[in-house]
């Protein structure tokens, strides 16, 4: 599973529209649809009901959307921690004073 697929899932889940999600992600709609289908195949669950009246989250999609958001937040926190560590900004700082 790729983080990119989770980002795409969250974008479509928020917009409930593949075209608007694609615009927000700065990608074309067909690759977005393919990525969502690949994610659904990998998970073995349909995330969206696609119909003539638009897109709706399935039960699985509604249950997994908050988890996808959490995973993306955790990945960003990990990435930021790694950047700080690489820059020497991470570590323990102990400060004491004498009165």
List the predicted regions and their residue ranges.
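N-terminal short secondary-structure element
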Residues: 1-35, 51, 55, 64
């Amino acid at each position: 599973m790729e983080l990119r697929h989770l980002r795409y899932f969250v974008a479509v889940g928020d917009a409930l529209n593949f075209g608007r999600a694609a615009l927000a992600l700065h990608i074309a709609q067909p690759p977005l649809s393919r990525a969502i289908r690949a994610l659904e195949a990998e998970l073995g669950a349909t995330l969206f009901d696609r119909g003539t009246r638009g897109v709706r989250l399935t039960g699985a999609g509604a249950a997994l959307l908050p988890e996808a958001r959490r995973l993306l937040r955790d990945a960003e926190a990990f990435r930021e921690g790694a950047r700080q560590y690489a820059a020497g900004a991470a570590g323990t700082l102990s400060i004491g004073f004498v009165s």
